Amino acid sequence: MMKFRFRRQGADPQREKLKQELFAFHKTVEHGFPNQPSALAFDPELRIMAIGTRSGAVKIYGAPGVEFTGLHRDAATVTQMHFLPGQGRLLTLLDDSSLHLWEIIHHNGCAHLEEGLSFHPPSRPSFDNASFPASLTRVTVVLLVAGNTAALGTESGSIFFLDVATLALLEGQTLSPDVVLRSVPDDYRCGKALGPVESLQGHLQDPSKILIGYSRGLLVIWSQATQSVDNVFLGNQQLESLCWGRDGSSIISSHSDGSYAIWSTDTGSPPTLQPTVVTTPYGPFPCKAINKILWRSCESGDHFIIFSGGMPRASYGDRHCVSVLRAETLVTLDFTSRVIDFFTVHSTQPEDECDNPQALAVLLEEELVVLDLQTPGWPAVPAPYLAPLHSSAITCSAHVANVPSKLWARIVSAGEQQSPQPASSALSWPITGGRNLAQEPSQRGLLLTGHEDGTVRFWDASGVALRPLYKLSTAGLFQTDCEHADSLAQAVEDDWPPFRKVGCFDPYSDDPRLGIQKVALCKYTAQMVVAGTAGQVLVLELSEVPAEHAVSVANVDLLQDREGFTWKGHERLNPHTGLLPWPAGFQPRMLIQCLPPAAVTAVTLHAEWSLVAFGTSHGFGLFDYQRKSPVLARCTLHPNDSLAMEGPLSRVKSLKKSLRQSFRRIRKSRVSGKKRTPAASSKLQEANAQLAEQTCPHDLEMTPVQRRIEPRSADDSLSGVVRCLYFADTFLRDATHHGPTMWAGTNSGSVFAYALEVPAATAGGEKRPEQAVEAVLGKEVQLMHRAPVVAIAVLDGRGRPLPEPYEASRDLAQAPDMQGGHAVLIASEEQFKVFTLPKVSAKTKFKLTAHEGCRVRKVALATFASVMSEDYAETCLACLTNLGDVHVFSVPGLRPQVHYSCIRKEDISGIASCVFTRHGQGFYLISPSEFERFSLSARNITEPLCSLDISWPQNATQPRLQESPKLSQANGTRDIILAPESCEGSPSSAHSKRADTMEPPEAALSPVSIDSAASGDTMLDTTGDVTVEYVKDFLG
C-alpha cells in the first residue's frame, strides 16, 4: 500500500493553462536613483537624459514613465556618454577604452534600448594589433563631429576619427601630435610632449572646427575641412576643461590651479600668448582644480559661467561644489556627495544668437539636482523621478494597495504644503522627451519607506516613475541635537564662499535611536503607527491643517518586573513635553514607550477597534489608544535569553562565554543521545521513514524533496523575539461564537492567541464606547521544530483571508464567511501549516525543504487575477526564501503552483528588504538607492511602455540587430518568464545580471483548481515527521 503514497499525479492540461493565465514572472522596472553613477549625457533635441554607472548600466530618462535600461556585455565603468542628437542613438565609452553604440528601437509600437556595434582598442587580446595604430591604446575623450563621425582623443596625444555607422577607423584622417607641434613656437616645445588629449569641443556654428586641449595647456583650433591648424593658444597651466563661446569668437579654459581663462579667437594665425581674462574665483590661496566649466550667453548680456571644483584647498577642499557666476552674483552650490557631471538645458538652434539657459542639471554620486536658472534665486525643480530613496538609509518598507482617492489627495496636499520655498520654481521638469503609452493606473499604490533619521517617506508606486509625495519626520517629538546642528550650519552659510545647501541626500543621522523599524497604515481612517529602534511606538493621524498640541505618553513594561534581567543597551528617547507645533500631515497623538527600549520587531494596527499591538525581543503588548491605556503586556523571554538584554550595540560575546556554551551543547547532546528512550510514536515514524526509503529506488527523483526538520533547542539565543502580530475576528472560544482576537508569533516557534473583549460601536458610529478592552489568553501553540513564526493569517469558511478593518463594514470588500469553519495559517521559517479553528488541529501542511538550508524570509497573501478573464482570480501564498527563490502556493490547500529564482542568494540585503503587494507584485533593494520591481502576476504588471520620435532611419540596422543575441536589461529588468510548464521544450531565455530564470517545478503540483471538488485539502501526513505541535487551550 505504501507505493501509492509516492505515485505522481499526471499533469492536468486545463490546470496548467490556467496557471499560465494567472502566474508569470517579470522584473519590470528599477525605481530610485542609479547606484554609483559615473557618466551623464543629454540630447537637447529629444529632451532625454542618459546616466551610466560603474557596473556598466545605461539608463535613459525622458518624461515621467519614459525609461530605457541596458547593460553592457562587459561589466566595466561607463566613463563618457554622447547622444547623436535627434537620432535616439547613444555612444558610450568604457574605462577599458571600448566604444559601444546603443540604439532605441521600436517594436510593436513600443521602444526599447538595444546595444548595437562596439569598438575595442588594439590592446585587447582578441584583436590583431597590427591592424591598429600603436598610439591608439587608451581613449581619453570622445567628440561627435557632424553627427556621423567621432573624434577620439588618446593618452598619446593623437586624435583618431571613427565612422559612427560602422564604428570603423577612418584611414588617413589621424591627427598626430607632430602635426600640431609644427604650428607651435620652438621655445614652447622645450623638448616636451603635448601630453594626453584632455578636451575636444565642437564649434556650434561651424562643425568642421574642433577645439583641442592638451593636458600640458596647449589649445588648438583644428579645421577638419582644410586639415590645418587655424589658431594656437599657448597655455602654461595644466588643462582640465574647455568650452566654446556661443558665437565662436572666444573660448574658456579651466585649469588645475583653480583658475579659468578666456581666450579670443579673433587674433589671427600667430600663436596667442596670453588670454584676455585670467581669474581664480576663490583665490588667492591655493585652490583645487576646476574640473569642468560651461559658458552660457544670455540676451541681457549677463552671461553664465558655471564650473565644478575650484574651492580653497586648505579650508574647503573636502566640499563638493558647483559654482554659478552671473555678472556680480556668485552662488556656491554645496552638495553632500561628489559631483559627477552637469549640463544646462538651453537653446541649441543655430539661428539663435544666445544660449539663454533654462535649467542646470547636476548629477551627483547620490542624487540628481535640477535648478531653475530663469527664476530669481535659482530654486530647485522638484523631480518626478530619480529621487534618492537613500537620502537617509532605508531601514524598513511597506506597501499599501488600493489607496482611496480621498486619502491620496490629502497626502498629496500635505506634501505640497510641507516645503514651500520663498522663490518657488516656475519651471516644469525640463527632461520631457518621449511619450508614455501606459494606461493610467486603475488603483493607487503607496510605498512607505522608514529611514535611519526617523522619517517615513511616502512614494507614489502606481506607475513606472516612483514619485515622492510626502515626508513624515518623528525627530521633532524627541530631544536630540538637531537644533544645535542647524544653528551651526546656518553660521557656516554666512561665511565666504557664499555656500548654499542644495539637495536632500543626508547620510548622517543625529541619533541612531530615531531609526524607523516598522510602519502600519490604515487607509480608511488615515491613522498610522510608526515604531522605532528605541522601543518608541507612535500613533499618528492625518490632519489637513497645522496644529499645536501635546502628545500623550505611556510606558509599557514588557518584562513585567521579571527578576534576573538587566537591560544593557541604549537609553530610551526623551520626548518633548508641553504643546508642540505640528505641520499639516500625519501628527502624533500617542507615544507608547516599550521598556526595555529595544527595537520594535513587529507592529499591527486595528483602527476599527482602536488597538495597536507591538512586539520586541522581550515580549509583546496591546494598547488601547482611544482610552490611552495598556491592555496587555506579555514577556516572551526564555530564562537563557541573556543576549536579548544587551541591545544591538553591545552584542559582542566573550571568547570564554562562547567556549563555555559550546561545550555545554556538546555535553547536552551526548547525554540526551544516551539516555533518551524512543517512544512508540517515534519508533513508528522511524519505521515508516525506513520503509519509504526502501520502497523508492535511490536513483528515482522524489518530488517534492522534503528533508526531516530537526527541532531546535528552547534555549537558542533571542528565542523571545516577537516576529509577527495579527488581529482577526474569528472563532477562538467555540465553533458558534466569533469575536476579536490577537495572535503573536515568536522566534522560538510559539504562537499566542488572545480572545479580546472589545466594546461594540453604536449603530452608525465610528468609534466604540469608552469601555476597557480585555484580553484573555485563549490558545498557545508550540511548533515542535521551534522554527521562527514569520506570519499568521486567519482564513474564513471559503478559505479566503479576512478583509482589512473597515473593508467589510463599508462594503469595500466581500464580507467573510462566518458560517463555515475558520482556519489559521501559520508560516514558520521551515514550513507552512493550516490549523482548524477553534480546536487548533493540524489540517494541511507543506515543508519548504526542496533545498538543504532553505528558510522562509518573507510571506504574503496575494490575489492573482486571470489575464483572460477579469472575473476569475485566486488567492495564493507568496513566499521568498533565503535562497532568493519565490514560491507561490494555493490557499488553503498549500499546493505548490510556481517557483521562480528572483534574487541572488548572496544578496542578503535584497532578500531582507523584499515587500510583496496584495496583487502579486513585489519590491526589493538592488542597491542602497534602488528598488527592483517584479511581478508574479500575468495580469498585474507595471513596466515602461513608451515611444520616442526619432529622425534616424532605424530599418537599416534591423537585420544586424536580429543577428546578434539580445542583451538583457540592467539587473534583469523586463524579462518575462511564464509558468514552468510553458517553458519546457522551448529555447532558454537570455540570462540577466540577476538570475531570473525559473527552476523545474516540483512533481506534486496541484493538477486541478483549488475550487474544484477534487482539490480537497490534503490530510496531515506525519510520515517521518517530528513536528507534532503542542497546543494549550486556556478557554476549554
UniProtKB/Swiss-Prot annotation:
Keywords: Cell projection, Cytoplasm, Cytoskeleton, Endosome, Exocytosis, Golgi apparatus, Membrane, Phosphoprotein, Repeat, WD repeat
Modified residues (Phosphothreonine): 957
Compositionally biased spans, kind Basic residues: 667-677
Main subcellular location of this protein, as a coarse class: membrane
Post-translational modification Phosphoserine, affected residues: 662, 964, 982, 989
GO cellular component: axon; basolateral plasma membrane; cytoplasm; cytoskeleton; early endosome membrane; Golgi cis cisterna; Golgi membrane; myelin sheath abaxonal region
Disruption phenotype: Mice exhibit disorganization and disruption of the apical junctional complex, resulting in hyper-proliferation of neuroblasts and brain dysplasia. Loss of Lgl1 in mice results in formation of neuroepithelial rosette-like structures, similar to the neuroblastic rosettes in human primitive neuroectodermal tumors. The newborn Lgl1(-/-) pups develop severe hydrocephalus and die neonatally.
Segments for region (Disordered): 667-688, 980-1002
Organism this protein belongs to: Mus musculus (Mouse)
Subunit structure: Associated with nonmuscle myosin II heavy chain. Interacts with PRKCI/aPKC, PARD6B/Par-6 and PARD6A. Interacts with STX4A. Interacts with RAB10 (GDP-bound form); the interaction is direct and promotes RAB10 association with membranes and activation through competition with the Rab inhibitor GDI1. Interacts with DCAF1.
Superkingdom field: Eukaryota
Compartments where located: Early endosome membrane; Golgi apparatus, trans-Golgi network membrane; Golgi apparatus membrane; Cell projection, Axon
Family under the similarity heading: Belongs to the WD repeat L(2)GL family.
GO annotation (BP), single: exocytosis
Cross-referenced InterPro entries: Lethal2_giant (IPR000664), Lgl_C_dom (IPR013905), LLGL2 (IPR013577), WD40/YVTN_repeat-like_dom_sf (IPR015943), WD40_repeat_dom_sf (IPR036322), WD40_rpt (IPR001680)
Pfam entry (one): Lgl_C
Described function: Cortical cytoskeleton protein found in a complex involved in maintaining cell polarity and epithelial integrity. Involved in the regulation of mitotic spindle orientation, proliferation, differentiation and tissue organization of neuroepithelial cells. Involved in axonogenesis through RAB10 activation thereby regulating vesicular membrane trafficking toward the axonal plasma membrane.
SUPFAM superfamilies from the UniProt entry: WD40 repeat-like (SSF50978)
Polar residues compositional bias, start-end: 679-688
Protein name: Lethal(2) giant larvae protein homolog 1
PTM statement from Swiss-Prot or TrEMBL: Phosphorylated by PRKCI on at least one of the following Ser residues: Ser 654, Ser-658, Ser-662, Ser-669 and Ser-672. Phosphorylation is important for appropriated cell polarization.
WD repeat placement: 38-71, 78-119, 139-175, 199-233, 239-271, 289-331, 339-373, 395-473, 517-592, 601-662, 722-782, 791-843, 848-901, 915-938
Gene Ontology MF annotations: GTPase activator activity
